[in-house]
Structures are given as C-alpha cells and as structure tokens.
C-alpha cells in the first residue's frame, strides 16, 4: 500500500480539444456481435475457429441468421461509411468444398453490394487471424479509398508486450 500520494509531472500535455481539419471520409467501427455464417448447433459441435476445434457463436437457426444479417446490413447501410472496422465476425474455420477464405465478411460485402451496386464495397482479405473463433475485419469503398500495401497484425510476434493468449490480434490497414 502506498503511504503517500503520487507525484505527477506532465510530460506530454494534451490539447483541451482536438484540432479538426476538413475531411471527406467517413470512418466507423461496428461490432457485429458474433456474426457467423456457420450455424451454431449447440454444445459439442466443435467446427468453428481456425483449427475447427471451437463451438460456433451467433445464430442458432438459418432463420435467426437471416434476421441477424438483415439487421447488420440495415445498420451498415444507414451509417454508409467509407471504411468500416468490423469487430466480432466469424474467423475462418478449415474450409469445406465450395468455401472460400473470409466467407463471413464476404457475405456482408455481398449484401451491401446487392443494395448499393456491384463493387461499391470490398474487404481486406485476411484469412484466419489468431486462434479465436472471432476476428476483426475491414470493409471499405474502393471508390473512396485504396489499400496501400498489405494489412498488418499486432501480435506477440510484433511486440512481446502484446500477449496473444489474452488479446485478439489487432488488424490495421493503410489507405
């Protein structure tokens, strides 16, 4: 237990408010709350996650998935951002016949493009990220921004202070 108060010396003072400059990009983060295109079959069905050894999350029936997808697409459409940082989307599992990497985020992009027109939205193809059943994703409008270089991940391999077993890898992309 400390016996006296801490001595604080400000070394990096912050402005009272940020200096805003004119811009024309709309960037948003959106938590899709366990959006899985793989139906959750309940306890004991270990088919999700990058190793196919985790229970799925999200919709328990095809009808529930349809409802969840419609709500997410309605919200994303209303926000209409140029770049979306997506949280809690299904991480790639071992792929079956006819499946392609990033299938959950690809499904949302297909839904957005069905409303706004082919090619209006795209996503950063990452494949599986980390070991959890969920990951992050990035959806963007190619007419507004262009990815520069490859995406990057913050993991223990990049910085030993980032503990993979306690944190999901962080996804970043320069546009």
Protein language model annotation of sequence segments:
Residues 1-175:
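Divalent cation-coordinating acidic motifs and surrounding scaffolds
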